[in-house]
Amino acid sequence: MISKISFHPHALNEKPVFSILIPSWNNLDYLKCCIESIRKNSRYQHQVVVHVNEGKDGTLEWVKNQSLSYTHSEENVGVCYGFNSPATLALSDYIVLSDDDYYFAPDWDHHLLEEIKNLDHMYFCICGTMIEHSPTLYSSMIAPHNFGKTVKDFDEQKFLKEFSSFPFDDWNGANWYPLVLHKNIWNLIGGLSTEFTPGMASDPDMMMKLWHVGVRYFKGVSQSRVYHFVSRSTARVKKNDGNKQFLLKWGMSKSTFFDMHLRMGQKFMGYTPDPDRNSFRIKLLRDKIKRLFSVWKRDA
């Protein structure tokens, strides 16, 4: 049983362009930096809705004083409830999922909104592009470009001067935050699946649910950029076996889904086609063996 969640809406004078959902777990310095960057560097007016997990470091008091909508739990309830609960307070037609350890670059919102305006439907999943300070295995991130590994040593002026100078293509997959969905689609898939609490593999599961309701426009927008400090709050929590849960739920591994469906990290080429039947069959056979082995280990 999770800790009881309380809901605290704050009225706005006008309808926001985006409702930005940010779960935070005793990470006040990063949350301040994140929200201040949204306020400074956004072209449009947005609603920020925070889920405060515990908030014993002063987060709860700070959020109350910022005239923000927020939800609160006295214990950490993970990212699934941490996104689903603030989503109930969203006032915009567009929901943005964000971590609390981002610095949003200027006009991040404009570039996402322009992508949305180019479409004539709501069946999309569009996200910004992360800049990280250390080398990464992910081709969908701009790295390494070190502007500071913590908020305390963040070189904001250098970042603002250089962030837009790194050449990078739009990319397939859109599995990273900040991620924007139409509220109707978010409601249609039921948000994040809480059986993945505290949250490992909840994002790929959400992407699979989007695929199943017909979303085929998965785009990472290069010009919409955030700096990611990689403040790993997951190191403080007992993790669920998300990879195994995903395999048992969907009958395929995350890697198969990323490679065959989302084409994660490849140069963006438009709407994502269905997987190649022959290649997909081979990967599914491998995953079926993995799944049977996982079930056998569970029941042994």
For the regions a language model picked out, list residue spans one by one.
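Glycine-rich, basic loop-to-helix element that forms the pyrophosphate-binding segment
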Residues: 73-90
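A conserved acidic beta->alpha catalytic loop
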Residues: 37, 44, 52-60
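Short, flexible, basic/aromatic active-site loop/helix in glycosyltransferases
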Residues: 146-172
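A short, conserved alpha-helix in the catalytic core of glycosyltransferases
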Residues: 111, 168, 172-190, 196-224
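Active-site donor/metal-binding and catalytic loop motifs
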Residues: 131-133, 194-197, 219-237, 245
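N-proximal low-complexity "stem/linker" segments adjacent to membrane-targeting elements
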Residues: 1-37
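Conserved donor NDP-sugar-binding/catalytic core segment of glycosyltransferases
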Residues: 107-147
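Short aromatic/hydrophobic "clamp" motif used to bind/position activated sugar donors
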Residues: 95
